[in-house]
Amino acid sequence: PPLTIRPQEGIVISLVSDLYLEQGFYFKAEGAQSTFTKDLATPLSPNVKSLKPFIEAHTSTITDFAAQAAVGKKGKNLDLGVMVKYLGAGFQTIGYPFLQSDRLDYLLNTRINAWKNKMNIVASLGQRVNNVKNTALRAKQFIGNLNWFTQFSDKFSLNINYNNFGFQTASGLNPFGIKNVSNDLGINPTFTFTGKKIIHLISMSYNYSKYDERDVMTGLTTSNNTHTGLLTYVPTYLEKEISPDFSILYFYNNVPGAKITLATFSAALSMQAAKKKMRLRGQLQYTLGKLNSFSSNNNLIASCNIDFKLTKKLTWATFLTTNYFKYGNEIIPNGANYVETGCRTGFQYRFDTKKQK
């Protein structure tokens, strides 16, 4: 095996206790101890406590503990609770090799159901303390998430979500502390209009993502900012065997040294034919892309799916596609382009595992 890979072993023993009281009150607690050997090739050590007969301690064996406790109250329309989690500096498990140890998390969790069950909010808010045992390198990080759904009427609903997650340590000097933190915000309104012959569904979504990363050698923090907007329109005909859909996608990504912009327009139509034995779907997609100050790229894709039902369990599936891409002036020669055409066909057989009577 590669010299960088070492034989390892570990064991975790945990004790879980849950207590539920009247009127929705609860208390949950868990304690765990890990004994982990980073390299089985190291010599045995009598100075480290073994966990026989499971593990015999080596010089690379470490033992530590972790604990988690939660207390709160659950109700029909309101949940409120507090959770505290601690992972010791030497706590490590085989199943999660990248688990961030030596940290303390405390969270306030809540769920709110209001407005005659038309509004639902699930949120958590708290703080993470890293390097708990090392005061000089101790760092604090905000953690939280939110999911807020509201059904304003039969025609309009709105969903808002926010997530913050990542890894952060205090910034020292050469090497500097690690920082990989992401903040994501999403807004998704949906409109539905119902007529006698058609149902109109309009869905819009906007997502903003900010990812900060610190270089451990230079100490510089770079940000990756992404904006994504999507507009989708799906009409459903109640008296026709056709299903069209239309969408517009906007994507913007800004990182040091590169700004990428994409705009995609898509239209598709699916229908049944040959007494519903054949299903057809065609799609046309055009993408306009731009990198920094170079001229725009152009991409046109046309595709078609043909599924023909030969028997109850056997289907003949065919896929056709043509892809035309024209580059901007970021490469030489300017205006370079290519056309790619593909055809894929095959048979699909569905096996029925139900027993015949």
Language model regions located:
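Exposed, low-structure sequence patches enriched in small/polar residues
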Residues: L3-K357
